[in-house]
Regions:
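Mature N-terminal segment immediately following signal peptide/propeptide cleavage
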Residues: 23-56
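Bacterial Sec-dependent N-terminal signal peptides
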Residues: 1-15
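Enzymes and membrane/adaptor proteins characterized by extended Gly/Ser/Thr/Asp/Glu-rich
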Residues: 53-61, 65-186, 203-207
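Phosphate/pyrophosphate-binding betaalpha-module
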Residues: 193-205
Length: 207
């Protein structure tokens, strides 16, 4: 069992991914030391994020144990269910993992996209009507705050698609709109809000 990852917790009112990822020498040294100890199979496992439902039944818990302890995956993506279950399973998975897991989430408009009982925000098309992009930035920070409360470190958002293709209706209200300039500005603001809030953002979809 590896020791705890040595890093200075990011204060809620002053989160900084840049400091955590680039400036903390102890963090980088810890990562290097762990990498040197991993077998080839374990290093390959670190490249994978496994999708699992946040359910408390025996079969699901056994599946969680298998992917964490046997396959030694690098991260988890919870999808659907109750917020309380995700929190409990996240804590359980982190206790089992020799290397801290990267907990990811697909929450384009926040936690409510996947989890019941969480704050509900408007779809991106509604947010695309907002002229003040500072509000989109603050929205991103709030989504990040809620993600961190659940132990989520990566949010697969925002959607950067421009809604101009009638043959691709699945995007629809998930897009900030049909203007490339407006979409780009909103994507940057939302991404910066997430990352200043301590959560990595992932713009999508490509190609």
């Amino acid at each position: 069992q590896l020791g705890p990852m040595p890093f200075t917790p990011v204060p809620p009112n002053d989160p900084s991914l840049v400091r955590l990822l680039n400036s903390d020498v102890r963090c980088r040294q810890w990562v290097d030391s762990v990498m040197q100890r991993l077998t080839l199979k374990e290093r390959i496992g670190q490249l994978f994020i496994y999708t699992i439902a946040p359910q408390q039944d025996k079969a699901n818990k056994e599946l969680l144990r298998k992917v964490v302890e046997d396959y030694k995956v690098g991260g988890l993506l919870f999808s659907g269910g109750l917020m309380q279950n995700q929190v409990m399973l996240t804590n359980e998975a982190q206790r089992m993992a020799e290397v801290p897991l990267m907990i990811t989430f697909d929450g384009e408009w926040g936690l409510a996209m996947r989890l019941r009982g969480t704050p509900n925000f408007p779809r991106n098309m509604v947010l695309g009507c907002i002229q003040n992009d500072t509000l989109i930035y603050e929205y991103g920070r709030e989504v990040a705050r809620q993600c961190r409360e659940l132990g989520v470190q990566v949010n697969f958002a925002p959607v950067a698609d421009v809604n101009i293709n009638p043959k691709n209706p699945v995007i629809n209200t998930r897009s900030f709109g049909e203007s490339p300039f407006n979409v780009a500005n909103k994507v940057v603001a939302y991404s910066k809000g997430l990352e200043d809030g301590g959560v990595l953002s992932v713009s999508k979809h490509f190609p």
